[in-house]
């Protein structure tokens, strides 16, 4: 259980840093470039933000794999098969709080699932706020 708790804190910190750096990179690099039209900068914001979310989902999927296979902290039931795609699918479903329920955690790994859902909620909210701020900057006609 201590290993799962440590993994939760580690992934929470990593995801926060990844998102912070990506949004900072987008803000400062877009402000300095005149080569991209104003409204097109919003497409870059959306794609960059999605890339950050995808990276975070991938990190959580890898952590599920390691926690299950290396540390034996639980397993998955339901429609789960032993492919990385299943880990990615479950991670994306959890991160976005979609929660179909076709795959479910068993054991100590459940705590990790809750932290991923909370992390996804906060990061998606952060992206929405950032996108709004960038829209107020770039969407209006000059």
Where would I find each of the regions flagged by the language model?
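Pore domain of cation channels
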Residues: 10-15, 84-91, 97-141
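Outer-pore turret/helix-boundary of cation channels
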Residues: 55-89
